[in-house]
């Protein structure tokens, strides 16, 4: 008799990551310029790697407290105060997680009951929708296209009027995929709007906080600490995507609930990574500075070139992505455009539809790539847009 296994119904409509699926296909094609993943092309700073070696030599290879090592929690608290002027008690308000993804997952699982609704400004990083649905919740999207990808207070009020049983909202700034972020005044306006709904848990994904090009990042925690979970980590700021170090920063009563999920799913984060991360957030508190300047240069080169080719761009002031509107004359949806660009010019980008229906008609390009690769991409995209094939056609279907 064959097995007849049933699965969680919440998974029925959840697909694998379109971004990663496309990237895996693109990797198979020789000489493809890949501008797909949000993967820094810098190496983890040497001093951090040395600390990981030191941890191994000290045999720091056992379980740690589920919340994180005391030294790391203290370093994280200092980092948030020094960088963003928000105070979190390392003993009660901070949780170390397996990257920002686990921080998001544990936070949403902690607040959602079956049928609860969560607001998600759109376009959005696709995991937000998937996690809400896995938790049995219902995502409610707020279209930001008409406001140049900026969430507005009136949009929050409108969504709260139209929907009942809304328990949370997921914010993301600097934003993936658009690169748009908020000034201090804009952040305060959003906080003031959300404060009118004390039942809302505000989950603020601020993983790109160290990459703001004009002004400085302002955390929602400065204005709305009592009802916010701020999510951050070292994947982007310290080029540590594989180390899986993330955090939640929230009031103690919220942190306790998130901790229940974390402890029962993960136990604790890798001990060696935690040791190295302690020094990343102390000795390496400004490690992102040279990366930021390099990203700024790349952004400017890429934005200028794409604009000249007819793409419309909401200028990205943060993260390392460009969200470009496909020129009207292409007569292709975003998926068709991306597949044709890969086939004809061997440049891999992400279709806007991967970030929700509001992303249709756009493509996301990552400038977490060398200037040499960006210039090669510009040359190939230029040839493609002008109707010529600049490179040998690939076999992509």
Task: Set out the residue ranges of the language-model regions.
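PLP-dependent class I/II
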Residues: 1-7, 12-13, 25-29, 33, ...
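Conserved N-terminal alpha-helix of the aminotransferase class I/II PLP-enzyme fold
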Residues: 63-97
């Amino acid at each position: 008799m064959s097995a007849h296994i049933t699965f969680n119904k919440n998974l029925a409509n959840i697909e694998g990551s379109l971004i990663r699926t496309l990237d895996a296909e693109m990797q198979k094609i020789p000489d493809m310029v890949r501008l797909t993943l949000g993967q820094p092309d810098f190496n983890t700073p040497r001093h951090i790697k040395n600390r990981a070696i030191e941890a191994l030599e000290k045999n720091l290879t056992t379980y740690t407290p589920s919340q994180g090592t005391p030294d790391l929690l203290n370093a994280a608290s200092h980092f948030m105060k020094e960088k963003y002027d928000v105070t979190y008690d390392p003993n009660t308000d901070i949780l170390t997680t397996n990257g920002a993804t686990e921080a998001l997952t544990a936070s949403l699982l902690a607040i959602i009951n079956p049928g609860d609704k969560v607001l998600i400004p759109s376009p959005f990083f696709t995991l937000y929708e998937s996690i809400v649905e896995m938790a049995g919740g219902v995502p409610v999207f707020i279209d930001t296209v008409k406001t140049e990808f900026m969430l507005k207070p009136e949009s929050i009020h409108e969504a709260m009027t139209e929907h009942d049983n809304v328990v949370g909202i997921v914010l993301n700034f600097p934003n993936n995929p658009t690169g748009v972020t908020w000034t201090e005044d804009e952040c305060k306006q959003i906080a003031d709007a959300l404060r009118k709904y004390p039942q809302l848990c505000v989950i603020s994904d601020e993983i790109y906080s160290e990459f703001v090009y004009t002004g400085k990042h302002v955390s929602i925690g400065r204005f709305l600490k009592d009802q916010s979970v701020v999510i951050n980590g070292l994947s982007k700021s310290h080029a540590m995507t594989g180390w899986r170090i993330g955090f939640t920063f929230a009031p103690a009563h919220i942190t306790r609930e998130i901790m229940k999920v974390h402890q029962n799913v993960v136990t604790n984060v890798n001990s060696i990574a935690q040791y190295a991360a302690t020094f990343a957030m102390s000795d390496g508190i400004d490690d992102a500075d040279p990366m930021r300047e390099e990203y700024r240069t790349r952004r400017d080169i890429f934005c200028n070139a794409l604009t000249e080719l007819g793409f419309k761009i909401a200028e990205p002031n943060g993260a390392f992505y460009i969200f470009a509107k496909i020129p009207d004359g292409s007569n292709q949806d975003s998926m068709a455009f991306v597949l044709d660009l890969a086939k004809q010019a061997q440049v891999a980008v992400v279709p806007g539809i991967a970030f929700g229906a509001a992303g249709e008609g756009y493509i996301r390009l990552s400038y977490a790539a060398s200037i040499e690769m960006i210039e090669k991409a510009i040359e190939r995209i230029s040839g493609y847009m002008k109707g010529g094939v600049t490179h040998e056609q690939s076999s992509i279907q």
